[in-house]
């Protein structure tokens, strides 16, 4: 997806992970904090970023700035779910995202739920397979979101009309 201009006042921020990291130096150990943040406007734009600093708040601020730099636009179906089922991978992590009927809600694990809430998705079913590492799962989720396409963009790519394209969940096969 394409990069998007950011607007600070409309962005929601979710702190996904905070770790204390240690660097061993000649005089002993040096401690710092690592933070992972997901930001979004709840209307189809989302980004994730990582920051490291001596204090938690500084690390969180750096992570938020990194997330705003990496924001992307995701096409939503009826402003509540994704257009089609998709699989994303990152290392040993694999996520399967499936569109859901209205009223289903967000059925997803911790870090994926933060992404969907920041994105503004209300109905989706997500399954993680393999690694449950927070960084890998978020990366795999973003890989899946990058593969999403609206019927309009698919039709333009194929030089067809939107009504000539049919996307059914049953037609998509997921290799596990």
Swiss-Prot record:
What are the recorded Gene Ontology BP terms? Answer: translation
Superkingdom is Bacteria
Q: Which InterPro entries match?
A: Ribosomal_Su5_D2-typ_SF, Ribosomal_uS5, Ribosomal_uS5_bac-type, Ribosomal_uS5_C, Ribosomal_uS5_N, Ribosomal_uS5_N_CS, Ribsml_uS5_D2-typ_fold_subgr
Assigned GO CC terms:
small ribosomal subunit
Q: Which residues form the S5 DRBM domain?
A: 11-74
Q: Which Pfam families match?
A: Ribosomal_S5, Ribosomal_S5_C
Q: Which GO terms describe its molecular function?
A: rRNA binding; structural constituent of ribosome
Q: Describe the subunit structure.
A: Part of the 30S ribosomal subunit. Contacts proteins S4 and S8.
Function in brief: With S4 and S12 plays an important role in translational accuracy.
* Family to which this protein belongs: Belongs to the universal ribosomal protein uS5 family.
Query: What HAMAP family does the annotation carry?
Result: Ribosomal_uS5_B
Q: What does the entry note on its domains?
A: The N-terminal domain interacts with the head of the 30S subunit; the C-terminal domain interacts with the body and contacts protein S4. The interaction surface between S4 and S5 is involved in control of translational fidelity.
List the protein's name.
Small ribosomal subunit protein uS5
The species is Rickettsia rickettsii (strain Sheila Smith)
């Amino acid at each position: 997806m394409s990069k998007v201009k950011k607007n600070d006042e409309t962005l929601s921020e979710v702190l996904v992970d905070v770790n204390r990291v240690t660097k061993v130096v000649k005089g002993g150990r040096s401690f710092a904090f690592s933070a992972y943040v997901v930001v979004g406007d709840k209307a189809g734009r989302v980004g994730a970023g990582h920051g490291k600093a001596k204090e938690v708040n500084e690390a969180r601020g750096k992570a938020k700035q990194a997330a705003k730099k990496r924001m992307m636009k995701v096409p939503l179906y009826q402003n509540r779910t994704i257009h089609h089922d998709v699989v994303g991978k990152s290392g040993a992590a694999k996520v399967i995202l499936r569109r859901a009927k209205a009223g289903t809600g967000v059925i997803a694990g911790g870090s994926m739920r933060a992404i969907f809430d920041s994105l503004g998705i209300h109905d989706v079913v997500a399954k993680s397979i393999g690694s449950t590492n927070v960084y890998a799962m978020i990366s795999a989720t973003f890989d899946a979101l990058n593969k999403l396409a609206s019927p309009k963009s698919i039709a333009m790519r194929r030089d067809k009309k939107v009504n000539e394209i049919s996307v059914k969940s049953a037609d998509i096969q997921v290799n596990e």
